[in-house]
Structure formats: structure tokens, C-alpha cells
Amino acid sequence: MLPSATAQHAALPYPNAATPKAIDLGELKAQSGTTPISVTIALSLPQLNEAENLLKSLSTPGNPQYHQFLTRDQFVARFAPSNADVAKIIAGLANYGLMVERTSATTLKVTGLPADMERAFSVSLHSYEVPAHGNVAGYTFHAPLTRPTIPAEIAASVAAVVGLDSRPSYHPLTKVAPQALAKARSVRPASSGDAFGYLTVLDFAKYYDVDPLYKLGISGAGRTLGIMTLASFTPSDAFAYWKALGLSVNKNRIRIVNVDGGPGAPSDASGSLETTVDVEQSGGVAPGANIMVYQAPNTDEGFVDVFASAIDANSAETLSISWGSWEWFNNLENSPVTDPTTGKTVGITQAVHELLVRAGIQGQTVFAAAGDGGAYDANNDLGCFGPYSPSQPYSCSLTLSVDYPASDTAITAGGGTTLAGVQDFCLNTACTKTYAVNVPHERVWGWDYLEGLCAALGAPNPIACGIFPGGSGGGVSVSFVEPSYQIGLRGIQLSQPGQIFRAGEGIAEDDEIGSFYALPAHYPGRNVPDISFNADPDTGYIVYYTSSVSGFGIEPGWGGTSFVGPQLNGVSALLGQYLKGSRLGLLNSPLYGLALSGQAYRNPGAPLNVIGYGDNWFYYGRNGYSPAVGLGTLNVAKFAEILRGQF
């Protein structure tokens, strides 16, 4: 029997280009009609506009309310739906035979039989099977044939109904060098210590001005890091990594919180390396901090619930997530497409946005990886990374697109760079013929700088070589409007015209191909990312990891903006300790305020470094902000000094 996407402890593989189309098994109620299923109802914040205005005040240096954060109880009393509103929803759903439990201040867990769910939300649920492929086991899930409709009597209080579709939906944002180039790799020591591909958090600290904080005794002590993830991991890997680096850590520093039963046992196919990276990097940058790992199944329901769990608990001062999907991911199935300014019809992005607003009001700092698909993030969902076909040499999507949740205005998005230095590659097995790639300055991570190497290796184009569209996720959101902290900043851009995607591609192998839709042109959207660190696998890091296939190993050559998110998480813990235990909240206004003041880059003691070279296959680095790399890279100790002056 195949594992089910609704069963607890069943590790599900994350989707990629190799995932087969699902087989429609027919109506769910005919397959397992007596087995209850669950959905999460995300409750709307009744005074969302007031909450967003408060977040702006709390996050803006110089505002009288700057950093006057609310406690959990204060937030609930002021902004959460009332008990009367919740009772009305519970009563309304009880009319359909559904059971309701309040799982947080703003979420409800609804359980019932498939037929009752269908009646409540006006859908027909089908069961689907994804066959095994390669070393990846098959699994089943359920999904509606049409979009759900929220019952009229409760619709005003509901932001989202999430979980009627239980398939794995999100991708880890770790990246490894393409196989053709990895085989050609030859190691040369980097200028700052370890060789490229073998860097550690100690090298990160040297490159980005963290060491001065360590010399002051700052380690993140007294702080709690939160990791939000959709795959489990092996904690001993992280402890082995920290021990190898000589870091002194508390043996009881990690606490695991299983959300919705947890994601199942660790496995390569489910993305366990991602969680391993998150814990090793954040906990290595802040070795004195405690770590809470909130891990949920890789479903829409798990995605929303992992945010709700971490934010409602309010135990971690700083959080990060390194999973995502392209911004319009939920419009690919069962369109019609909705107005981009109002969010998706099922409300996943709206539900998470309201949770992120709450996090900022409570003083929690939240980071997201900006993506590894350059300016074309949709390729992670539309299948760019499948086998190269000479008959379809341009099978990748050229739709400019950004990753979610990095595109949300209430989160800090981490982009990626390539470190300066020389990279050596072998052009034959004996390595008697070599090719050197010289990167004279730290630059935007975009693998087009390797096109000469690809030509030398005989690859006919960047897709065949495996380098397109690898690079720092960045661009312009067409779902989230430009936030106040980006208004007036040079380099902020509007969305480009002529961007098309194909909607309604269907779930199952015999579904019809859908229509083409134009994304909004010249839309004044939120620009992504905000800040960057090294993320190029070719100037990347080692990971201590227990593979479900090959066992424990020390794996070199890893990168992706998945490293940047947890590194920022660790940095935030250091900053909190440096600032005498203060919470930092949403960091975007302080960061952008530096650029708007003109003091961000002007002297050796400046908090930001210009990344004026390179591109992410469309957007170029420049002096100041760019949608390729954000504001540049951070000098952490210098930024800490500036933050101290704002308290």
C-alpha cells in the first residue's frame, strides 16, 4: 500500500521535474470514504489594516512606537477573531457534520469524512496516485476537481481553507552544482580559508564581518532560533558538524516540534538535507542559541500550520524557512486566475501574510530563501530541470517570476552571491587539460558566468549544461504591492510586460492542458530579495548529512539561498544578544533606511557592501538596490553598531 499524503509519519518526496503525472483513482469517498480527513481554516484578522499599520510603526526607526512589540496575549486581545466569531464558524461547520478544534489564535483544525467536506466546501474530491520513479517511492493524495467555496455563513471570518489538496507542493531551496560541472571540479583554496565548496560557518563569519561580535563574547546565548521546515532530519549530523568546527554547544539545544504529526522519517527524496542545512548553518552562526525545529508534512496544510505553530507559540525570537514555490503556484491548477492584488482564491498567501504580520508585531524576525532559479523561479514548478532534449532546447520557462514566501512584504528575503576567486575545472578525466574561471569581484550569483566552461566541455547551450536558470532568486512580485520601505529607493523596478504562464495544466496524466495567461505588466510590486550572502554551490559549503541511501557523509559543493536564510537567522540571534536581549521584529525598514539615508556604502565602516557585478540571468547588480541581489551583502558587526544607536 502506498503512503498517503494525509497519513502521519509518511515521508513524502518533494515535487520536481522527474515527478510523474498522477493517476486519477476516482472519488475519494469511494476509495476511503470512512477515513476522516482534515483541513486548516485560517481566520481573518478583523482589523488587518490596523495591524499592518502597527507593524510599520513598530519596524520604522524614529517612530515613537519603534520596537514597542506586543506580547502574544496582547496581540490576541487586540487583533485575533473573537470567541463569538469562532463559535459561529464552529456551529456553521457542525451543520455539515464536521468537527472543529482551535489550534492557535488564528487557525482551526477541521476534521470530517470526505463526503461531508465535499458538501461543506462545494467540491468533488478525488484520490490520486503518483507512481514510484527511480529510487523515489510512490504515494497517494487527494485533491478537489474545482476550487473550494467557503460557506456563506462563515466566509467573512475566513482567510483560507487549506488542505483539501494534500499533495506535496513545496521545494527545498538548496542547490548543488550540475553533474557535468561537478565532475569537472578541481579544488583551489579560497582566499578566506577553506576551499570553495568546502566552506563552513567559520568562513561565513570571516567574509561577512561576524568575527568582531564573537570576539565580544556574542554567541546568541539566551536566544532561540526557530526553523520552519517540511522534512525531518538527523540531529546527530548537526552536532557532528559543530564539533568538527570546534564550536561549543549545549547538547540539549535542539527541540523538535512535530506539526500535523510531523513530516515522517528523514529521507533524501523528502528534502531532509534542507533541514540539516538550516540547523547546521543557523546553529553554527549562533552557537550559543537554542534551536526549535518546527517540522510539518509537505502539503499546503502543513505549510500554513508550520507558520501558525511557530508564530502562535512565540517562543523563537527569530525564524527562517528555506522552502518555497513560485509566487503563482496555486494558480496553475483549476483556474480561473484571480486578481493578483487580492491573493489566491484559496487564500494560502493571504493566510501566511496575516501570520507574518502577527510575527512582526510580536517582535519575531522572519527570513526566507529567495530562490535558486535566478529571475525565472517558475522553472522549479514547471519542470526546467528535467533531462535535456535536443528537440526542445528551450524547454525552460522564460517567465520572469519570484519565489514565495520570499515575496511577502512582511518577511526578509535572502538572495545569493558568488564569491571572488579562481575556480578550476578539469576538461578531461586525467585532468591534464584544465579551465580556470576567474571571478574578480563578489558578484550576483547567476551561472551564466560559466558559459565559457560549458562551451569548453562541449555543452550546446546553458540548459544542456545544467546552468540555466541557476542563480539568486530575484525580481518583482505581481501578488504583493511595493511596500513602504522600498518606496523612493533607486533600483526598485516594476514588473516586465509580456510575461505569460500556462494555467490549469491539471493534476493527472490525462488532464487537458490549460490556457495561457498574462501576468500583470508594469505592476508596482514588492522587489525581491532584500539582502544577500554567498549562495553559489561553486563557491559553496560542506554539509554533514546522513543520506537515506548512502548513510553518513561530508558532502561538499552545496549552496543555494537555503544557506542564506538560516545564516540570517543565526545573525539575528547574535544581534539580539548584542542589543541586550531585545527583539528585532521585521528588519526591512532598518535595512532600507540605511540605503535611503545615503550612508549604507560610503566608507570602510559601512554596514552594506555594493554588489555591482553579475546578474541572475535578467537583473544586474548595481550600485545600490537591484532585484538580483537586493541591497548587497551585510557587514554584520557594522550593522549591529547602527542598530544599537537606534535603541
Tell me what each language-model feature is.
Residues F618-R622, L634-F639:
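Basic/polar, cationic surfaces and motifs that engage anionic cell-wall
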Residues Q8-S104, K109, P114-A369, G373-A375, ...:
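Substrate-binding/charge-relay-adjacent region of secreted/lumenal peptidase catalytic domains
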Residues L2-A7:
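Sec/Tat signal peptide C-region and signal peptidase I cleavage site
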